[in-house]
């Protein structure tokens, strides 16, 4: 026992605890201390090394030997997860199983065959849980600034997904967003998903985020990020299962079953906990409780990829670092400090390598460190009292008042660090504080909760050790001044101003925010008034200079106090600021480009009718959009104006308010123009007219953008409101609106939309009409028995088919074969074969029939060598068979006289005897005889005979004359008869294929109609 005590004392003497994360970062290279508890190092599927929980790990040795210990008491609580709170189950998800299958097939290595519907449904249900987790974290992060941007989604991805998977998903999201920003040509005529290169619908995800109240304001980039992430996550999960040794292979092709799928996920430590139904996130271990490192943290893998010899670790160092990352319990704060030190020394370079939060990297001297309070908070959650019992100076307690958390719910240290770092990076802070650890505990442990982090002055307060004493003192005094103002006591304003430094009342915090901005965030009306009276700049802006203010949140750059008051919807404060002379457009100056959202844009996105009305009364312009900082924008006023934001979020009342205000302003301007024009000359009148024209074009473009977003997100009522103003349809907005109405079973709106199709210019026809439009319209025709809708769809199909003639059937030029003089036709003389047709003999010659077709050759083969072999033909009429023989003996169709009553039978006979040229000749005759009365009968016969060319011709006739045919009962029966497998044809499906081919030839080809 004494020997063990000396070991612990010696170990603790080697540990240092400072304001960072321990001093061992400088000396651990020389450390020979091994934290390994087991010699069992095995390779693991989707991680580095995993640690088996062997009996040796249950031993009560010193605390460093029990970092990963499974205590005996844990066996009683292994089933505790059954009592844990569960995630909410989603009734609707923003994807379909068809989209999931297409997303998987997007990668060639995943195209190995058809995935069963049950497997797709199970995969969808599991990944749905990851969506809920990410959305819940993004929802909490969005409370700070009252909106969900790509940064909130990105940080949520980092918190929920493992190191390796999050990097891949963020890369996919960034790629989708880059493609979207670059696809500015004809952007209102193409879907957001197409512009992003995604299979999943960005519009569905946006609508889902709004309906789920992820935030009162959702930026379209956030929806793109989440869509790209989830699509990538589906492929990531499927790839890992595909590469799992659990999946059996049949001739090299993976053979999936639900059992093998579940087993593969259970063995993957990066996916198992993520896809569990519980609210807390089980990380770093698989279903058997085996801990393992993810791919990106595997020292063996990274060392093999490292090109620098100096970066190599010895075997003992590798085991020490791995054990530090996988630690689940600690016995003291000193031990934890050392473990965090080792882990951070290894993780920090990887964090920089995969840095992707959108801000410039800090200098190496400003790497993220752990504040002492953060370490103490983490120690509280990781502390194991039993590990102190080995200390001879500590007597174990005789009475236990608390139950320990079982091992199965304790995350390894690397997961604590991952989540805490994600929170710190989201704040743009250079230090992890205690609240970051509490937020991590809320996520990683069952039954732990805490409030979301609020926007405070000390969020990013950090004093570098490289600052001299005077600078450090000034920084602390400034922080004290902000705290005094933040407490809400107006009597401390003057004293606080004296502490803020040279900037006085307009001094800025690390986040680039002034005391007035913080007061607006809190909605402290009295403090706002006091600060204004003290001389605070009412139009101060959050700076753009990242070098001086590295903790500025990107989405708040150039924000003013009015912006923050609107963000948090404090209407009395907004009223106060406007009365005091605040710029109603925020930081926007006349004639300047706007790189941040105006207060009216923010109010419109939130749907706050009262706030929108107030800003409009004060002269806010709803036409102003936002220019992206990369300079990409097709609109002179920027993108996503107030109209678009209200429409995108489905705030119909706000949208109507914006419209009514602009119409009122337009009337006032016109009356003023008329007054001025009374005494002006012609040149001045023309100038006013041109100005009005420019304004009208700008508004039309703004409303087109709003129409695009409302249709993408499924707010069809707003789309129709915009259409009623005279804004023209694009094919895309029309199709999206039609799809929404069909899904919502809104028959009157469907009828109205179908009637509007004729207003779409043919130049608008794109590939989307074929890939999305035709399947949708034929689905509506199949599902709806409404005569009005059927008639309208028939008119649309006829319009799409075009005025050009149906492609003609052409004769097949028969190759020159053996022929006999017609004199020998049915001539008994010299005949060597006799056919018995309807009981009558028909004489023929083998020399001719052997070369006529394979069918005749087969009939004549293996017959006795008798001179006049008799072959019975039972299903062909005598006169029809005579026409067939006449065709063969004459060598063509010129001498044939075919009656209309015989052509169908002759077509069947020519098909049976495999005489293609004669068959085509009969098909041409049938095509000439087609009319509204005979078309259905001929079509059914052609389908029965499997004559594709004639069937396609008749389908063209159907489409060209569908407006008339849809009224006829035989045609209705043909369309709506339920197809039986391998029996009746699916006519609607065939019509869709024929129409798609036609549209490609006359609308999408370069010749535009010459190919028919």
Swiss-Prot record:
Pfam families the record matches: Ank, Ank_2, BTB
BTB domain sequence ranges: 831-897
Domain of life: Eukaryota
Record's GO cellular component terms: membrane
Transmembrane segments: 160-180
The species this protein was found in: Danio rerio
Subcellular location: Membrane
Name under which the protein is recorded: Ankyrin repeat- and BTB/POZ domain-containing protein 3-B
């Amino acid at each position: 026992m004494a020997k063990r005590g000396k070991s612990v004392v010696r170990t603790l003497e080697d540990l240092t605890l400072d304001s960072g994360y321990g001093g061992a970062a400088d000396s651990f290279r020389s450390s020979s201390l091994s934290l390994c508890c087991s010699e069992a190092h095995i390779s693991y599927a989707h991680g580095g090394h995993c640690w088996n929980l062997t009996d040796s790990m249950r031993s009560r040795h010193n605390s460093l030997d029990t970092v990963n210990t499974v205590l005996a008491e844990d066996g009683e609580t292994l089933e505790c997860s059954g009592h844990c709170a569960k995630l909410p189950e989603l009734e609707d998800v923003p994807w379909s199983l068809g989209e999931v299958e297409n997303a998987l097939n997007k990668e060639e290595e995943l195209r190995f065959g058809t995935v069963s519907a049950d497997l797709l449904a199970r995969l969808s249900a599991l990944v749905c849980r990851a969506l809920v987790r990410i959305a819940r974290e993004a929802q909490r992060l969005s409370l700070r600034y009252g909106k969900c941007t790509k940064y909130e989604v990105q940080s949520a991805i980092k918190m929920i997904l493992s190191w390796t998977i999050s990097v891949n998903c963020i890369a996919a999201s960034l790629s989708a967003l880059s493609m979207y920003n670059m696809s500015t040509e004809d952007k209102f005529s193409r879907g957001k998903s197409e512009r992003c290169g995604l299979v999943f619908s960005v519009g569905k995800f946006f609508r889902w985020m709004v309906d789920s109240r992820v935030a009162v304001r959702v930026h379209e980039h956030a929806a793109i990020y989440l869509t790209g992430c989830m699509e990538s996550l589906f492929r990531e999960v499927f790839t890992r299962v595909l590469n799992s040794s659990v999946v059996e292979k049949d001739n090299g092709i993976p053979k999936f079953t639900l059992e093998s799928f579940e087993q593969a996920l259970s063995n993957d430590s990066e996916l198992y906990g993520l896809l569990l139904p519980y609210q807390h996130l089980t990380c770093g271990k698989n279903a058997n409780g085996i801990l393992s490192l993810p791919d990106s943290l595997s020292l063996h893998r990274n060392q093999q990829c490292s090109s620098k010899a100096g970066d190599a670790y010895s075997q003992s160092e590798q085991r020490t670092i791995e054990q530090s990352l996988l630690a689940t319990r600690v016995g003291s704060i000193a031990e934890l400090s050392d473990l965090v030190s080792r882990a951070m020394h290894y993780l920090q370079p990887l964090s920089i390598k995969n840095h992707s939060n959108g801000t410039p990297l800090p200098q190496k001297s400003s790497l993220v460190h752990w504040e002492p309070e953060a370490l103490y908070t983490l120690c509280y959650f990781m502390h194991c009292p039993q590990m102190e019992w080995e200390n001879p100076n500590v007597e174990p307690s005789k009475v236990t008042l608390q139950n320990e958390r079982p091992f199965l719910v304790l995350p390894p240290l690397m997961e604590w660090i991952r989540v805490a770092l994600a929170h710190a990076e989201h704040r743009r802070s250079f230090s992890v504080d205690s609240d970051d650890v509490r937020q991590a505990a809320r996520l990683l442990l069952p039954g732990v909760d805490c409030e979301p982090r609020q926007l405070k002055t000390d969020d990013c307060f950090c004093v570098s050790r490289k600052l001299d004493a005077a600078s450090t003192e000034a920084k602390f005094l400034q922080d004290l001044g902000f705290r005094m103002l933040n407490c809400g006591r107006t009597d401390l304003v003057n004293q606080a101003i004296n502490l803020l430094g040279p900037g006085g009342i307009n001094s800025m915090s690390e986040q680039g925010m002034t005391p007035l901005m913080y007061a607006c965030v809190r909605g402290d009306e009295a403090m706002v008034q006091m600060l204004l009276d003290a001389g605070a700049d009412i139009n101060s802006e959050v700076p753009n200079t990242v070098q001086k203010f590295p903790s500025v949140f990107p989405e708040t750059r150039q924000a003013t106090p009015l912006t923050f008051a609107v963000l948090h919807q404090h209407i009395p404060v907004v009223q106060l600021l406007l009365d005091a002379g605040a710029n109603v457009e925020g930081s926007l100056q006349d004639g300047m480009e706007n790189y941040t959202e105006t207060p009216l844009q923010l109010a419109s996105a939130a749907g706050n009718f009262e706030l929108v009305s107030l800003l409009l009364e004060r002269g806010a312009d709803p036409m102003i959009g936002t220019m992206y900082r990369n300079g990409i924008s097709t609109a002179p006023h920027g993108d996503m104006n107030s109209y678009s934001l209200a429409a995108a979020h489905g705030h119909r009342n706000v949208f109507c308010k914006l419209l009514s205000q602009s119409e009122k302003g337009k009337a006032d301007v016109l009356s003023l123009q008329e007054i001025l024009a009374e005494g002006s000359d012609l040149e001045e009148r023309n100038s006013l007219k041109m100005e009005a024209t420019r304004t009208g074009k700008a508004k039309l473009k703004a409303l087109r953008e709003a129409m695009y977003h409302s249709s993408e997100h499924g707010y069809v009522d707003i789309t129709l409101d915009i259409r009623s103003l005279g804004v023209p349809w694009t094919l895309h907005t029309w199709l999206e609106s039609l799809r929404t109405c069909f899904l919502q079973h809104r028959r009157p709106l469907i009828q109205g939309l179908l009637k509007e199709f004729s207003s779409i210019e043919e130049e608008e026809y794109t590939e989307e009409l074929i890939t999305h439009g035709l399947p949708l319209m034929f689905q509506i025709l199949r599902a709806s028995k409404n005569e009005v809708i059927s008639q309208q769809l028939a008119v649309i199909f006829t319009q799409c088919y075009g005025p050009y003639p149906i492609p003609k059937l052409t004769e097949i030029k028969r190759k020159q074969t053996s022929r006999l003089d017609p004199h020998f036709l049915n001539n008994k003389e010299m005949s060597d074969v006799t056919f018995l047709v309807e009981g009558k003999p028909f004489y023929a010659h083998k020399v001719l029939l052997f070369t006529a077709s394979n069918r005749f050759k087969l009939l004549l083969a293996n017959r006795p060598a008798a001179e006049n072999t008799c072959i019975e033909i039972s299903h062909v009429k005598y006169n029809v068979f005579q026409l067939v023989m006449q065709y063969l003996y004459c060598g063509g169709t010129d001498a044939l006289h075919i009656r209309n009553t015989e052509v169908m039978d002759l077509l069947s006979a020519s098909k049976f005897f495999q005489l293609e040229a004669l068959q085509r000749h009969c098909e041409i005759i049938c095509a000439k005889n087609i009319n509204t009365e005979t078309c259905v009968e001929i079509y059914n016969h052609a389908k029965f005979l499997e004559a594709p060319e004639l069937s396609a011709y008749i389908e063209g006739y159907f489409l060209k004359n569908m407006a008339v045919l849809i009224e006829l009962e035989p045609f209705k029966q043909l369309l709506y008869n339920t197809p039986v497998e391998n029996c009746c044809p699916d006519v609607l499906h065939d019509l869709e294929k024929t129409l798609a081919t036609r549209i490609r030839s006359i609308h999408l080809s370069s010749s535009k109609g010459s190919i028919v």
